[in-house]
Amino acid sequence: MIRSLRAVSRLGARGFSSFAAARQENTTVGTTYQEELDVVNQLKGSVTADDVTRLARMRNIGISAHIDSGKTTFSERILFYTGRTKEIHEVRGKDGVGAKMDHMDLEREKGITIQSAATYATWIKENQDYHFNVIDTPGHIDFTIEVERALRVLDGAVLVVCAVSGVQSQTMTVDRQMRRYNVPRVTFINKMDRMGADPWKAIDQINAKLKTRAAAIQVPIGSEGDLAGVVDIVKEVAYYNDGASGETIRVAEIPEDLKELVAEKRDLLIQTLADVDDEIAECYILEETPTEEQLRGAIRRATIARTFTPVLMGSALANRGVQPVLDAICEYLPDPSDVVNTALDIKKDETPVHLTPAAKAPFVGLAFKLEDGKYGQLTYLRVYQGQLKKGMSIINAKTGKKTKLARLVRMHSDEMEDVDSVGAGEICATFGVDCASGDTFTDGEVTYSMSSMFVPDPVISLAITPKDKGSLTNFSKAMNRFQKEDPTFRVHFDAESKETIISGMGELHLEIYVERMKREYNVVCETGKPQVAYRETITTAAPLDFTHKRQSGGAGQYARIIGEMSPVTDMNAVNEGKATFAAENIFKSEIVGGKIPEKFILACDRSFHETAEKGPLTGSRVLGVEMLINDGNTHVVDSSELAFKVATQRGFYETFMQCSPVILEPIMTVTLTAPVEFQGALIALMNKNQALISDQDIGSEEVTLSGECSLNQMFGFATHLRACTQGKGEFSLEFSHYAPCSPHLQKELVDAHQKKLQAERDGK
């Protein structure tokens, strides 16, 4: 697939630092930001004046944060202040309506966002209309794929941080995702009306924990219940929110008691920008005071270059400080023409091609989300090049299938607005397109392909069976639909246990799908106990020498393979805590002179990877194993691809057991938050679950503990946490790495697997 400047930065973001050497680094594709800027300017030279005007007033943004930081409440204010909705509805409002962006019944009942929701809104700034495509994303780690696919197609984001809790576990996850897709952000410190709100501590945490240069461009007027508005440090004016819902902005002079603080924070802003912007650095060296225009320009340049994030503050729930964030989105976040997007030209040996956001260019778009709507499958598309028009035909670059678009819509949560066309840089949805998330579409004039989003592996599984055998048809429909919608939701049938197994990112993730099956398909299911996704690997090398011989009259089977099996992982580095177990399996052939024909080697390769799907210890997937074949024998009559396939499979199992095999269990990063009086109870609970505590953050109201714990210890943890914190604690889990389980647990798992196999043999 694609090597995109925007999309494939799994190894790290194109991060920049204040230092000259770091400014030259670009971990994605080996280019500097200046080189990227040169490409942007070159592409802008190939678009029309109409394209430039249209794109300059367009923003594709996401709202991301830790769970319960106020993302959806903030999104509701955006809808209200832009005139998209006529009244404000809260996430847990008393009017029974619920937030507009949480359109699923389950979301409104649980008070959390499960699916990302998109909307289109218009904001007027300085008498200019700016058009926003806004995507509100979930905060819970179990629904991380919703954040991944949103950030994949967005040009900028608003990172919402709680003024009381500061940077939390999922904040750090979202930060990594933004870096993966090179998405610049502005930061909004929310909940400034809460007791214990400390925006300066939150900014310090952004700098320290996220390793991102951040500085305030606002100072709050008042605090907690007396929060009245904000002072704009750049423009040096005060903004007050008046009206019943804070809809009226009153501009005034800076309050006398805040002038000293504003001057201090303005100096700090200039110092921070001097580290990342040459123009401000020159002013700083010459001891000149930058003008407002110079500061605004520097903030925009540094934000788009992802070397800096401007920090705004307020309270979405109290209707304070939201409108200035909308202005900041217009002023500091990039429009679609400021971002380099690259595809591969399949007909030209996958040569990278920069996409031009011009209306007259050949159409190129990416399907980033599928949803089952009232009128069939709804496919969300981001248009990167050209125009998408109602009635035109588009071609799936992967399958070659052609589809005529009968309907184009802009989304407003679960409502739709029909449109005749959408241009480059826009997001829309359509019906009747058979595809998967991440598929590229063109109009047939070009053969381009774009990369998909990063999809993490599931960490938890459970068996599921419909109670009523008459529901099997609907059960199958639900499974097929959910898999198409969510790449992190996996389904497979276990031939040994004769059970359907579903896998996902956590207990809540699977619980939601079981509940959706009941509500949307009227299928009530029984579920087994959640099972950990164990893995198997080896820790030492051993020689491989296996002969498969079978004679049964006529042509028999003969294959001999000689070589070695060894761990891919550097075990010394693992033992020293400098590395984790490798995830890939590697097959190598060093056969010379045609001693084993190439077609038999290919059969060995396929058999090796197939066999690695089920290890000999517990039937779990094998990872981090290398098989080398450097010798062997064949028989002129009896050797075949099947014989070498069997020899590889049996040789794999036999040698695997000689390589000091171990079972690996998923280790999770766990973060607990509760009122400070429960600190002792949280520590005791972590110790009880054999967690290794790595960090404590004790605030005025809350205490946060972070550490690592095996997933096996975390089942039922929510119940124990509620009990020891009187229902006031919360926790989050995120997969960290695989590590060997204890010898005692390994023996238990191996014995249980052997008993299961014996029971199946006896049953036959």
UniProtKB/Swiss-Prot annotation:
Keywords on record: Elongation factor, GTP-binding, Mitochondrion, Nucleotide-binding, Protein biosynthesis, Transit peptide
Q: What is its main location?
A: mitochondrion
Query: SMART domains annotated for this entry?
Result: EFG_C (SM00838), EFG_IV (SM00889)
One GO term (biological process): mitochondrial translational elongation
The protein's matches in SUPFAM superfamilies, at most eight in alphabetical order, are given as: EF-G C-terminal domain-like (SSF54980), P-loop containing nucleoside triphosphate hydrolases (SSF52540), Ribosomal protein S5 domain 2-like (SSF54211), Translation proteins (SSF50447)
Record carries keyword Transport: no
Cell compartment(s), UniProt: Mitochondrion
Give the pathway: Protein biosynthesis; polypeptide chain elongation
Q: Name one GO cellular component term.
A: mitochondrion
Q: Which residues does the Swiss-Prot or TrEMBL entry list as transit peptide?
A: 1-23
Q: Which family does it belong to?
A: Belongs to the TRAFAC class translation factor GTPase superfamily. Classic translation factor GTPase family. EF-G/EF-2 subfamily.
Q: Which NCBIfam families match?
A: EF-G, PRK12740.1-5, small_GTP
| Role | Mitochondrial GTPase that catalyzes the GTP-dependent ribosomal translocation step during translation elongation. During this step, the ribosome changes from the pre-translocational (PRE) to the post-translocational (POST) state as the newly formed A-site-bound peptidyl-tRNA and P-site-bound deacylated tRNA move to the P and E sites, respectively. Catalyzes the coordinated movement of the two tRNA molecules, the mRNA and conformational changes in the ribosome.
**Name the record gives this protein:** Elongation factor G, mitochondrial
